[in-house]
Amino acid sequence: HLLQFRKMIKKMTGKEPIVSYAFYGCYCGKGGRGKPKDATDRCCFVHDCCYEKVTGCDPKWSYYTYSLENGDIVCEGDPYCTKVKCECDKKAAICFRDNLKTYKNRYMTFPDIFCTDPTEGC
C-alpha cells in the first residue's frame, strides 16, 4: 500500500517521501518514461518494473504486513500478492537508502517533458 511504502522510505532514508521522491526524476511517482536520471531514479524504475510483474492484484492499494527487526524490513504474511508487493517496496526503500549520497535536489521536482530519451524495457 502506498502509505506503507511511504513509512518504509521514511525509516530507511530519514527523508519525507512525498517531498523527496514523489516527483523525482523521470520514474518516481506517477508514470514514467525516458531514461532514469540517476541511481535514485533507477530505484523507481526498478520498483515500477517489480509492480508490473505482480499480476492479479493492485500493488498500490493492497495492504501487506511487515516489521522492522534490527533496522531491517521483514515482509510477513502468506498471500502471494501481498508478500511480493511488500518485497518490491522493501527493495525500493533500501535502494533509496543506498543511494542517498548521490541524491540530487535538482531532480526533486523534475518536469517529465525533459524525459525524452528512449524508454528502457524492464
Curated annotation (Swiss-Prot):
Its EC number is 3.1.1.4. GO terms for cellular component: extracellular region. Its cofactor is Ca(2+). Disulfide bonds join C26-C115, C28-C44, C43-C95, C49-C122, C50-C88, C57-C81, C75-C86. Signal peptide: none annotated. GO terms for molecular function: calcium ion binding; calcium-dependent phospholipase A2 activity; phospholipid binding; toxin activity. One of its GO terms (biological process) is arachidonate secretion. It is found in: Secreted. Gene3D superfamilies: Phospholipase A2 domain (1.20.90.10). The keyword Lipid metabolism applies. Its main location: secreted. Ca(2+) binds at Y27, G29, G31, D48. PROSITE patterns: PA2_HIS (PS00118). Binds 1 Ca(2+) ion. The active site is at H47, D89. Expressed by the venom gland. It comes from the Eukaryota. It catalyses: a 1,2-diacyl-sn-glycero-3-phosphocholine + H2O = a 1-acyl-sn-glycero-3-phosphocholine + a fatty acid + H(+). Keywords: Calcium, Disulfide bond, Hydrolase, Lipid degradation, Lipid metabolism, Metal-binding, Secreted, Toxin. Belongs to the phospholipase A2 family. Group II subfamily. D49 sub-subfamily. Snake venom phospholipase A2 (PLA2) that displays edema-inducing activities. PLA-B is three times more active than PLA-A in edema-inducing activities. PLA2 catalyzes the calcium-dependent hydrolysis of the 2-acyl groups in 3-sn-phosphoglycerides. This is Basic phospholipase A2 PLA-B.
